[in-house]
Amino acid sequence: SENEIKTQDIKLRNLPAYFGVDRALACLEALKIIKNPFQKNLLIADFGTTLSLTKLTAKGSIIGGQIIPGFLTQLKSMEDYTQNLSSPRNYKIPFQNFVINTEESMLRGVFNSLTGIINLSFDPAQDILIICGGDSELVGNRLKQKNDEIIISPNLVMKGMISHYNG
């Protein structure tokens, strides 16, 4: 339709044509909300069906990214591809790393897989991390407790869409 946003409509440096519109809009908005006084790179972690990581230089050029199964996707795959595991009914992630209860073990394992990739990819000395997406608060609040270089902005993509239309 005439109001459809296409990747090529978004003005970002080094933006590949195949890049998802949602990721591009998140980048666009992240560059607006960050006042980059230390000229740090920007790492955007969009926690949804997938966890998409996108890294930009301090000047706003896309370096690249990673895409991994998201929180619910990992839980659902355990339920679908194993015989005796069911997705937990609540998502209260235990603070202990090793737990006896199966549902809590699944939650802790998925949480550790997602935060582990963040910890491997995010260097607070060189990066500012912006966390967005539907599961951003579930995971982001635990990460933020450890670092000031983290911004949680759950609706980053939607805000990017609004910014794009308001031009």
Q: For each predicted feature, which ranges?
A:
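Nucleotide/phosphate-binding catalytic cleft detector across ATP-hydrolyzing
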Residues: 1-42, 59-167
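Short beta-strand scaffold segments in enzyme catalytic cores
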Residues: 44, 51-56
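Gly/Ser/Thr-rich loops at beta-strand to alpha-helix junctions
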Residues: 49-52, 136-137
